[in-house]
């Protein structure tokens, strides 16, 4: 469990990489096929742009998370490896068609799209994102779509425009506990993120709402528990919890490696609050997103079947 109080990045990374963070890389034919399919379309993925440690695992399962609205972000968060720019390119009007072709080639039934923050656009990129989603609905009408969106700088109209596009899961990450947010996230606030999540839950009560946090940044156990309570109180249904891993020496250092037992503990805390928790050292927002979606759908179906008839 984590016990550091200071968020300042002055301490070095813990000396030893624990055994639970060592994994075999399942490279093979399927990985190569996924790699070729994505690169042939010239599509950025968060798997590559953010240096995700799960890329080989996911691509070996014919799954990937598409990065929409470019490969450079207008924010420079201390944990993220995506390139920063003050002058990003305009949204690509053909991006939806490219993602659809790639998703068809991979045989995706659950499509996950994340986005860079586009503070240069009036609606934060919501309209461009909706255009992509509408294209996917046309080209892959049976596929479900999960979107990991930015906070749109608190623009509720932009959020509602996105939610009206008929997505299966709305995901927006708080990323860390409230105390550490100013040191971890650029131009974002913990309370604004909670506000966006709560608004989504109230706007579409049947929508699956999702958020995620990283641990190992210097948070207290009590702060993680409070964050889970905050998410539950603001209408979130699914929460992912994973170990923060430093992409490079210019990023925020790791303060601690959280044990599998602690992840199990956080899972039990979240479940006691009614949350669906997916927690573990390698868990990321979109890691095994298709399986999480199916498990959540089965849980909701099971719960609804236990409810009394209204007649």
Curated annotation (Swiss-Prot):
Q: Name the principal localization, coarsely classed.
A: cytoplasm
* Keywords from the named record: 4Fe-4S, Cytoplasm, Iron, Iron-sulfur, Metal-binding, S-adenosyl-L-methionine, Transferase
Q: Where in the cell is it found?
A: Cytoplasm
The record, for InterPro entries, names: Aldolase_TIM, Elp3/MiaA/NifB-like_rSAM, LIAS_N, Lipoyl_synth, rSAM
Residues recorded as binding [4Fe-4S] cluster 1, renumbered to this chain, are: 47, 52, 58, 286
Q: Which cofactor does it need?
A: [4Fe-4S] cluster
Which CDD domains does the record match to this protein? Radical_SAM
Listed GO CC annotations: cytoplasm
The free-text cofactor remark is: Binds 2 [4Fe-4S] clusters per subunit. One cluster is coordinated with 3 cysteines and an exchangeable S-adenosyl-L-methionine.
Pathway where it operates:
Protein modification; protein lipoylation via endogenous pathway; protein N(6)-(lipoyl)lysine from octanoyl-[acyl-carrier-protein]: step 2/2
Q: Which residues bind [4Fe-4S] cluster 2?
A: 73, 77, 80
Which Gene3D superfamilies does the entry mention?
Aldolase class I (3.20.20.70)
One Pfam short name: LIAS_N
Protein EC: 2.8.1.8
**Which terms does the record give in the GO molecular function aspect?**
4 iron, 4 sulfur cluster binding; lipoate synthase activity; metal ion binding
Family statement? Belongs to the radical SAM superfamily. Lipoyl synthase family.
NCBIfam families, per this entry?
A: lipA (TIGR00510), PRK05481.1 (NF004019), PRK12928.1 (NF009544)
Quote the protein name from its UniProt record: Lipoyl synthase
**Organism of provenance:** Chlamydia trachomatis serovar A (strain ATCC VR-571B / DSM 19440 / HAR-13)
């Amino acid at each position: 469990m984590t016990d550091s109080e200071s968020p300042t990045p002055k301490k070095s990374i813990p000396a030893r990489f624990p055994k639970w963070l060592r994994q075999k890389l399942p490279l093979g034919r399927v990985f190569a096929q996924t790699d070729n399919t994505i690169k042939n379309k010239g599509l950025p993925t968060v798997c590559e742009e953010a240096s995700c440690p799960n890329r080989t695992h996911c691509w070996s399962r014919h799954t990937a998370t598409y990065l929409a609205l470019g490969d450079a972000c207008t924010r420079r968060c201390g944990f993220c490896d995506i390139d920063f720019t003050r002058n990003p390119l305009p949204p690509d009007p053909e991006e939806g068609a490219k993602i659809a072709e790639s998703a068809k080639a991979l045989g995706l039934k659950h499509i996950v799209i994340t986005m860079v923050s586009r503070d240069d656009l009036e609606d934060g990129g919501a309209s461009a994102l909706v255009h992509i989603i509408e294209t996917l609905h046309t080209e892959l009408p049976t596929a479900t779509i999960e979107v990991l969106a930015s906070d749109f700088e608190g623009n509720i109209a932009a959020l509602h425009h996105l939610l009206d596009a008929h997505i299966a899961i709305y995901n927006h990450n708080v990323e860390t506990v409230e105390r550490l947010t100013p040191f971890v996230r650029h131009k974002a606030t913990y309370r604004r993120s909670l506000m966006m999540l709560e608004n989504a839950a109230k706007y579409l009560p049947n929508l699956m709402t999702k958020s995620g946090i990283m641990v190992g940044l210097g948070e207290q156990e009590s702060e993680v528990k409070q964050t889970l309570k905050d998410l539950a109180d603001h209408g979130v249904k699914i929460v992912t919890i994973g170990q923060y891993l430093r992409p490079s020496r210019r990023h925020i250092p790791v303060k601690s490696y959280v044990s599998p037992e602690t992840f199990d503990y956080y899972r039990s805390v979240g479940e006691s609050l009614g949350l669906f928790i997916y927690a573990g050292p390698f868990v990321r927002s979109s890691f095994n997103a298709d399986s999480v979606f199916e498990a959540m759908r089965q849980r909701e179906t099971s719960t609804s079947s236990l409810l009394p008839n209204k007649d």
